[in-house]
Amino acid sequence: MNITKMKLFYVILFFISSLQISNSIDFNYPSAFNFGDSNSDTGDLVAGLGIRLDLPNGQNSFKTSSQRFCDGRLVIDFLMDEMDLPFLNPYLDSLGLPNFKKGCNFAAAGSTILPANPTSVSPFSFDLQISQFIRFKSRAIELLSKTGRKYEKYLPPIDYYSKGLYMIDIGQNDIAGAFYSKTLDQVLASIPSILETFEAGLKRLYEEGGRNIWIHNTGPLGCLAQNIAKFGTDSTKLDEFGCVSSHNQAAKLFNLQLHAMSNKFQAQYPDANVTYVDIFSIKSNLIANYSRFGKHFTKPLIDLNHLENVGYNKILNVLGFEKPLMACCGVGGAPLNYDSRITCGQTKVLDGISVTAKACNDSSEYINWDGIHYTEAANEFVSSQILTGKYSDPPFSDQMPFFLTLKF
């Protein structure tokens, strides 16, 4: 941090007592079970396919590859931390003596709601992930019943399945992937069938005892460098923020129908607790107002609109993100620093020249990590906004004050 930023940062600290601090929920889940794609994959695809995911992935928080498609922690990592739960071990990773006592992660990068096909990045579709969970639960209960206390340290007790939290963040690959072979109208027409499959999966989880369900909607897909590079070469197809309009239109319709389905499911199963979380609005707000949000205003649940109202908008602009769409790790330079032929950390010969997709100097200035996934700094911001409860339906009940802590 340079001298100017340091001075302005301490001005914020001096006046911190004047800020309005949001309240946070007192989470009391003994366990968590997660389903999804790369947004929350903590190593399942890497273990399942036997592939490598090297540095600079994981360079910030783990100092080594964490098997996450990110420079550090994901949204789910921050949420687990707030719930006083450990980071979730991936279901398919058997090395390192994984502990599943407080939950398990079934999410795998590239996964879809619809069944996988021969061209899918991941074979672990939503339905298959649920089947893995059912086997996990059955096998864990069997081991605990047969071996007594031998596995108590590593496997969930039976009541953790009914009391635990079931988190789901999947669907972006169904929508974004469809644009490679379908028109916008065809993509929009396919959404009901996608959600029918999703609803069937929810019912399977309910039948297995899942009662506390979080459903994250999909983010602004048109703002990912991968989609801009492929579908945004015609500037007339971009919105005011430089995002592909068609992709965001599809994401909005998907989310609208997903929200309606979530409400219907809640009505059908009144003993369930279904929470719909509007990730699209959080990420869209971040991209549209990137200079107002940054690495020093993520963990604290500060009402950032209040900061601006009391005259600190200039300080926010200095401390905020600097690159809303450009990838930190990639090749090609501005405006996107993305080339679909090479992924973050790889070295390849492109157009007769050997190039390496390297990370930027300071990933905390970027929202996008590799053209597809978000940086740790952006993920921390997203998780902090989730925890305000303002983006959930129903909103989190305010049960306890959130004690302000600042990370340097």
UniProtKB/Swiss-Prot annotation:
Gene3D superfamilies attached to this UniProt entry: SGNH hydrolase
Glycosylation sites: N273, N289, N361
Entry annotation: catalytic residues: S38 (nucleophile), D370, H373
Main subcellular location of this protein, as a coarse class: secreted
GO CC entries: extracellular region
Record organism: Arabidopsis thaliana (Mouse-ear cress)
Protein location: Secreted
Family per record: Belongs to the 'GDSL' lipolytic enzyme family.
Source taxon at top rank: Eukaryota
One Pfam family matching this protein: Lipase_GDSL
GO BP annotation list: lipid catabolic process
Single Gene Ontology MF annotation: hydrolase activity, acting on ester bonds
UniProt name for this protein: GDSL esterase/lipase At1g54790
EC number: 3.1.1.-
Signal sequence, renumbered to the chain: 1-24
Record keywords: Glycoprotein, Hydrolase, Lipid degradation, Lipid metabolism, Secreted, Signal
EC class of the enzyme, as a word: hydrolase
